[in-house]
Amino acid sequence: MLSFFLVLLAGCGKEEADFSQARVEVVLSPGGVGDQGYNDQILRGLQTAAVRYDFTLAIHIPEEKEQGIQIYNDWLNAPLDNDCERSLFVFSGSEYEYLLQGLTLPKDARKDVLMFETEQAVDGIYTFFVGCYAASYLAGATSVLDNNGEEQKALVIAANPHDKQVKRAVDGYRDGYLAAGGNGCDVHYLSEELDGGYRMQDEAYQFCIENDGNYMYYFSAAGASNKGVYRFSRETYNFAVGMDDDMGLFSSFINMSVVKHMDWAVINLIGDLLNNKKIPYHQVFTYESGYEEMVFSKEVTEDWFLDISHIKNRIVEIEQRYEEANQ
């Protein structure tokens, strides 16, 4: 297990309050750092928040998720110094959801627990998730290059069928693709295991190779496994859609990405707690929040694609209907 501490110096002109006596301790997803996506965005948000608010940041990268509970218990049982203003503990990633219901909460009012990202609402724990259905829907609709009846299909590579956020991405992309006139959208799961499929980039790459030329677009919602799809796109000149962040640098044939601005959400949530703002224990951020969007890669413009303004104008309503139907 890797652990490290960051004491980051903020610029002299910063206007935010000084929280130099505050501490934020984070346990990241096992093997997640370096995915150039979701986990790296969270890490970037934590580092930016540490600079902005001038707190001490302690980061743990466990080899297995079970180590996360031991790290938490060490934090829970460690007494705070009298001059410590706040101490936040962050579970970063839905892999730790199984801990929520039976978690012992701190008695010290200066301590708070957070979890990124989960749909569970638990009293005493600050949780949130950033949706991706609307942004994926727009990416799917944009991927239809010709709706004049020509046969064209898309392929979605997904981690597993159990992750609700993966399901949002899969459903959104497929629904948008079909709504805009695509002829079909197949889905392939890398794993049937509850937490499987996120670190299988070789398998993702091989499956795409076996289906080279069978699809107009390749979209992946599989954590670090996405890099296998990006490699396939780069080497075989197939169109692909990025996930979690702007992935246009991975391949010139990735001309759009579904972006979840986890860094923005992390910065704002930690800032609110350090400033003792009253916020809900559970928050849901959808397309209206600005934390999810579909972006075009550098030098790619909207006029390359079919006009989907009739879909864009209704995307908030479309996402609301989906969320209500899947509660």
PLM-predicted stretches and their roles:
Residues 46, 137-184, 282-303:
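An alpha-beta-alpha
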